[in-house]
Amino acid sequence: LNAEEPPSTCLMWLAYTMNGVVWNEDGRFNKESVLEALKYMETLINEELVAPEDKTSSGMDAYMRICGGTASFLTGPTSFVSRSQNEELCSVVGQIQPILVPGKEGKAAQTMPLPEAIGVNKLSENKEAAKKFVEWYTSADMQKQLNKTNSAIPTRNSVLEELINDGTIQNSGAMLEQAKIVSSPFPNGVPSYYAQMSSAMYNAINKMALGELNAEQAYDEMASALEELINE
């Protein structure tokens, strides 16, 4: 819950898996959904289910808890599916399995990918060359290579299925089934002001984690910042 990107994506994921919505069509937060997710996070903090050091440590340090056996559940980068099978990185190999993301009742109907992506900058002077790079980088062969060298999980479901079936990705659990319910929480695509919006989100969440704001105040702070961004 440090003031960096992971708390923002955590809030998005919670709201989206709980209620199927984060932003309304006009780009503003869906207050009911986002506030419910914030209150859930606040409950975890108040009931001391968040390790004190995770309020100020990096997201990667928090993620690595799953590989050290000090966490029982992780929502984070899919690369940890492969990391959890690497004895050099994980002390509990064989004890971790991907499951379908839970919803408020039973399984969630949808989940989301992280908002990072690769594309061609509108200011690029070599758009065709850049497009070819994107096509190469996201090709099936390159996705296999990136899994081998970087533990990156393929975004192509066909490649993911192939690596699971040939045993490259082991202990895959519900990963393939999960991949089929991934969708974007952004009704109009990722906004141009995403970085500023995310900053407002994670700073408000961090203040809540440190006891400086309650859930309602955290929501008001981030919603106010988003309103300013929309009106610029």
For each feature predicted by the language model, list its residue ranges.
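Extracytoplasmic/periplasmic solute-binding protein
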Residues: 1-30, 71
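Extracytoplasmic/periplasmic substrate-recognition and gating elements
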Residues: 47, 87-152, 203
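Paired acidic/hydrophobic, glycine-rich loop segments that form the ligand-binding mouth/hinge
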Residues: 72-77
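Long, aromatic- and glycine/proline-rich binding clefts that accommodate carbohydrate-like moieties
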Residues: 98-100, 148-200, 207
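Sec/Tat-exported extracytoplasmic proteins
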Residues: 18-19, 44-49, 70, 84-88, ...
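Glycine-centered hinge/linker elements that transmit conformational signals in sensory
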Residues: 26-55, 97, 101
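Short, well-structured alpha-helical segments that form the helix of a local strand-helix-strand
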Residues: 215-226
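Short helix-initiation/N-cap motifs at beta->coil->alpha
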Residues: 53-67
